[in-house]
Amino acid sequence: MSYEGSDDWRRVLNDGIREYSAGARSSDAFGRVLCNAREHHFVIDGPVWNGCPGEALTPGEAFLASVAACGVELAQVIGREDGIDVGPVAVRIHAAVNREDPVREDLTVFNRVEMRFEIGGVDEDQARRLVERMGRRCPLYGSVAASAAELEVKVEAHSTRGTG
């Protein structure tokens, strides 16, 4: 559903509320989940260590890819808002859960998360500011940062513009 050109689009822009919806249901194959968001449909598999297929993205991989995608997209958006000509952006994220040493007893959260941002067309200071602002704006990153026992974020700037 596109809000552009409708009153709903203006409401989203004016009241500051951002809403997201997605769904999932089991399939005929154990551990294979049929997912949807808006009109997009995709498969997520449970991991092999749970006896699931593990062929498609796992829930953890899909979540981490979403965190990384939010970082890339918002670095570009914030750069545009600030009049910075941001070049190619890449984000790598790695996370670990240690079931033998849980962070919390009531919920499973990541013990350690490492993120690496590479941002082209900017200097080191601009890159760090973009990542800092992204962190305040992305609810996925915020969820990870607020819950992980350890969070390491590395930022690398490339003042030359690449082809992305």
Map each language-model feature to its residues.
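Alpha-helical metal-binding/catalytic segments enriched in His/Glu/Asp
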Residues: 70-71
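Extended beta-strand/beta-hairpin segments
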Residues: 1-65, 76-164
